[in-house]
């Protein structure tokens, strides 16, 4: 049996998202969180990552039962697995992490450029949504409804690792995260390319059903509590609301995004 795995020590990071600092004078990163490595755990995130030809792997830890299941799922593995006890993975994660006997260390996926988005794309843009559970759930919905990408800001976005990857349940391998320095500038660029920029807010000026949807389309979602920032809102062609008949009129942002994606898919 291999010796217990010891992860790299994180460098001091202050309040930087992702927990890693950049060297002095280095250019801003091109991925959310500026991470040096991604940690994935759980069956779905690990299986989908191992199937992704664009991933570069560093280390795979697996319990005996999990390794058997992994080989049944995908056959030959692209990285050699190290057999460990469940407790060894437990020590690497928070107590509430459900790892199912799998822990994968790999390189972060590259972030594509805005210019690479197709001319008929439906994409999401997240305005400083920082909760990794929400962003992961949004990625999962984006994969389910065929969104081409999710645009996030380099700062004020969770790193594409750990909790986010677990919440995405493998969707991180199918929907690229496009990391931009300034969301407003990105929306201006997309507008020049002909994208319909549709913001969402519970107090939106128009009901979603009244908007003439077309492609290319970028749907802009704001953080819970803060909503869309002023410049973001001003750059949207419409700010729509979801009509809900019940006593609670405000939805979790990941739920609202799923509903918006479903509505857009039905009106193609």
Task: Give the location of each predicted region.
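Short basic, glycine-rich beta-strand/loop surfaces that mediate nucleic-acid
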Residues: 96-107, 171-172, 214-222
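RNA substrate-binding interface of SAM-dependent RNA methyltransferases
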Residues: 62, 119-206
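Short, acidic/turn-prone active-site loops that include or flank metal/cofactor-
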Residues: 65, 86-89, 155-156, 224-226, ...
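Active-site/ligand-binding-proximal alpha/beta "capping" segment
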Residues: 198-252
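Structured adenosyl-cofactor binding patch, chiefly the S-adenosyl-L-methionine
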Residues: 47, 52, 143-144, 163-171, ...
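N-terminal positively charged helical leader segments and presequences
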Residues: 1-113
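Short glycine/serine/threonine-rich phosphate/pyrophosphate-binding segments
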Residues: 133-137, 228, 253
């Amino acid at each position: 049996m291999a010796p217990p795995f010891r992860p790299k020590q994180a460098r001091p990071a202050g309040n930087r998202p992702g927990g890693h600092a950049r060297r002095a004078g280095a250019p801003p990163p091109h991925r959310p969180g500026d991470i040096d490595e991604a940690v994935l755990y759980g069956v779905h995130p690990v299986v989908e990552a191992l199937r992704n030809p664009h991933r570069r792997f560093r280390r795979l830890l697996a319990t005996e039962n999990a390794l058997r299941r992994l080989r049944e799922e995908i056959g030959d593995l692209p990285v050699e697995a190290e057999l460990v006890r469940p407790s060894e993975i437990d020590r690497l994660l928070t107590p509430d992490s459900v790892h199912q006997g799998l822990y994968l260390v790999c390189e972060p996926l590259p972030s594509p450029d805005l210019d690479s988005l197709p001319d008929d794309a439906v994409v999401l843009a997240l305005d400083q949504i920082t909760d990794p559970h929400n962003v992961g759930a949004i990625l999962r919905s984006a994969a389910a409804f065929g969104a081409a990408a999710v645009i996030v800001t380099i700062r004020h976005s969770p790193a594409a690792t750990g909790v986010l990857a677990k919440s995405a349940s493998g969707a991180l391998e199918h929907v690229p995260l496009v990391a931009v320095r300034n969301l407003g500038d990105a929306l201006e660029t997309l507008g020049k390319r002909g994208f319909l920029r549709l913001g969402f807010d519970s107090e939106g000026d128009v009901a979603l059903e009244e908007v003439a949807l077309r492609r290319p389309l970028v749907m802009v979602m704001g953080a819970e509590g803060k909503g869309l920032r002023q410049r973001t809102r001003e750059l949207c062609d419409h700010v729509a609301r979801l009509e809900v008949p019940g006593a609670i009129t405000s939805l979790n942002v990941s739920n609202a995004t799923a509903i918006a994606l479903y509505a857009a898919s039905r009106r193609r």
